[in-house]
């Protein structure tokens, strides 16, 4: 048998915005989660669903940082890609951007099977901020788009079960501290791309697991799935049963439909054009859930599509597959165990009523289940040629625990400057002081790292990180004590003062929080060494929080003073133009505030579901919100 699968490098050039630096301030506040069902609404749900809805929901982004440094100025940029192809399919993978499959082309017909976004435009939809639309994405961690959406993954060539080659992607997911892998290959003579996925729990305790594979397809596609009912989750933020099909192109607001596929039925979902051609996704039974997401036909949904993909590019909808029935649930993964499954993506032409029969002809279920079993031993095969490098966090965890994770090596050579102080803490029991004055690096917060911080010499730098870890653990009083202990001897006060200000706000002490924020910003301005990326990001992040805290307690003149201290380039960013409009309004300068809107601005990091622009506009004007600012995801009456 001649194996014709090829894996090669490619460079894509497309209009792309810069990702920019991460926000250097630790994310201490609770998550603003729109995908949440109230306790009282769970009583009418199936018992297993209600239990998993309440099982270990994510409460903090730590140790991950927020990615909000991107803008909206797009220029032609090169993006590294890996292409896996045979004579039937060509898949284009972006290892530096979450391992996204950006394109899947059926070569005999030339059809693009996915929605291929013509631009790279991050927006605030991932758990930690930056996310982009299009293709097939791998979501792991917790309800929402993964924190790895715009992060690099490790990638390498690996032998495939049929004697050809696989492209392996792997990384360490930091919210739950779990290693995972995605093996992509094209079986000889097949029209399907296979994706073997494995998530491992190396810990001595159970861990909540979340996985959803999301596929963007053109918006005009008709979705077909083997279910009669679905669980609908819309702008009311309630789960309710709905018949299938219960949705059409006139759905006004964004909505999710989680399909209730009967036990024993094959797991699949498909999307077809008007001529009956399209994409089908199927999996082994481990990947239980299927879902459709639409932005809706209302002005807010249309605006979001333009925001993510540009004007005139056509919209998209998503078909998805996950471990649980809904994305609001997390599944228990027992100690020292793993879960794996096999997915397939490929072309299918069929009438809606004959999809399952056509799928069985194209990819028999028994044959596919056997392919999963045949792949499992290959999941442990050590990678060959490395094609891309991810983060060093997995290497640090493997170094700490001496875990053996065959198939997904986390080599010490991947450790970088970010991991260096934590490696030193692991080796010597001491967290080293920074060699130069700069904003603090990220904090590790897992129990084993917190224990090491508690026994390390109590320097101000260590106390800062210990406080962040204690805050994450829910020990807020002890976190405050750690930060306060560090203040008298700390060479850099602003990181500690900012943490204490957040604590004050959480306890309702807003006057004291504003004072601490003002002191923190003054200290940062004195300490700032240059206008480089790190210091600029710190000043912008802390400046924004400080202005907001001062406005909250009506210290308007002080808020204006902070605003005027910000760099001109920072003040021109859309987020700060919105803040300026609010500042002008509370100063009594309504006409000037309205002029900010009339001049136009774009809040690059506008959060999905945020109504901040609309609320401020309502305070300024009686007219309807201009279309360019309308990102509404629910009726204004709610």
Residue ranges and their predicted role:
Residues 461, 495, 534-541, 575:
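Start-of-helix register in tetratricopeptide repeats
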Residues 1, 43-85, 136-190, 220-222, ...:
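Extended, loop-rich substrate-binding clefts of extracytoplasmic carbohydrate-active enzymes
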Residues 80, 85, 91-109, 169-221, ...:
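Acidic, contiguous internal or C-terminal segments within carbohydrate-active enzymes
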Residues 2-45, 82, 191, 205-331, ...:
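A contiguous, surface-exposed recognition patch within enzymatic or periplasmic domains that forms
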Residues 2-54, 81-151:
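Acidic-aromatic substrate-binding/catalytic surfaces of carbohydrate-active enzymes
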